[in-house]
């Protein structure tokens, strides 16, 4: 609804805006798992900045060091100059993330976004191998710039490019054929047949869980087979951990569950800790064949984000507490969603860690559930090729009570949409998510 308070968005901001159309209010403050709008209404956040706020809004553990850094006139814009904040981040990344996992990676700062990281990864893979094609998968999403779009599956997003998207080919993701065709049968055949007309690719890029694609979860054995396939054919393996990294699936890296070591990893979103723009590309040392300045970006040295990223790593990843808590909360979400899905035909669930989805055979129901949930004080969005999946991405730091409250609103919204009345036992408040 357009009001005097929202008219400026309608009159001045581009039609490309999206989220505000689904959540038609003006937000003012946020803390932890909550946002508040101008009317003082509270909303539980099961969206978390599309995965950029794994540690919640304005986490005090991160906020105070950021305030102190700014107050001390610390470097803000540093390009790729050496700064004290960058040094501390690199040291903490090495000691807290790499060393305990036995990883040997070089670190590149490509720019502030996940798409920047993907573009750099694709560019590096092609440079190192001398090959052009990159393989990706059905329903993949890797960003909105041209290179990232070329390895993205969604037709609507690809259409926005306005030019042919070349030097990429798409393969079936795990479960694409509903387990009626052996995994990798097509991929292996065309790669190994010299008459297939299919040139050996530079790399394969994959999400271990496809977030925008509909919460499609790759099985451990599928990921292991993919890693082996790439290694045997000297194809670089890129894992896009922009949304699923930084603990979203439980471990820091989403690929840890499969025991594989990608050649290249892209990180963004929650790597900055506080929601500040930051992206990293990690790669094996022998792949570091960049010439100085061969790839750059004006805002690759966002030092305030270095500060909050370092504190987040030190605070949340020095032990296994967050990983264990995420897995426990994820099990609760899975159980609750399975219960509500069992009450209605045409519903199915999927997920890992604290990324979960509930899919509807009637895609229109997913959007209606999100609308009802918003009216009752919960932010959730849809994903999938037809927006048929309600996607849950709560902050990893959400409390058990907040998680229960959000699930109560969500399951009540599902009940309302699927039956037209509140048949289930869950209380579904008509107005706002009252903080408990």
Curated annotation (Swiss-Prot):
Signal peptide: none
Cofactor(s) the record lists: pyridoxal 5'-phosphate
EC number: 2.6.1.76
GO BP, sorted A to Z: ectoine biosynthetic process
Keywords, comma-separated and alphabetical: Aminotransferase, Pyridoxal phosphate, Transferase
Claim: Lipid metabolism is one of the keywords in the record: no
Name listed for the protein in its UniProt record: Diaminobutyrate--2-oxoglutarate transaminase
Source organism: Nocardia farcinica (strain IFM 10152)
Gene of this entry: ectB
